[in-house]
Amino acid sequence: MQIDHGRRSRPIDLIEIERSVAAGHGWQEVLGLVLVRLNADSGTIHLLGDDGALHLKAASAGIPQVVLDTVRVVAVGKGMAGLAVERKQPVNACNIQTDTSGDVRPGARATGLQGSVVVPIMCGDDAIGALGVATRYERTFTVAEEELLIDIGRIIARG
């Protein structure tokens, strides 16, 4: 199925996510819709708190407890989520198990996941959180997928 990322029409999956956010169904349900749309195995939603740190609002099943404990609060500029917020740009890793860019923290490897992308959740020009998805296999997310995630992030920001 081709997705039109143009601003003139809204893809059906964005409308479904927008309805879920507007209905207050919760970040966990929104994350589930995102994972299905991106054919991803895992994901997280972090939002900036009053303390300036990113706070975990939703996480998919299967993330080890030790990792959840580590990512419950993330400093801006640390790890893929913190870097996406700091840079206001997607952070993409084909395989977090073998990545040598410095963008992937050692704790991320404990998930056993490989392909991963995290985008900033933007409210206007401000990054207010991070939306990340990952797969159990090597995968470089496309620019179109990154743009879709950024659009979803803008919907989350309105929630």
Walk through the language-model features, giving the residues of each.
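A short, aliphatic-rich beta-strand micro-motif
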Residues: Q114-M122
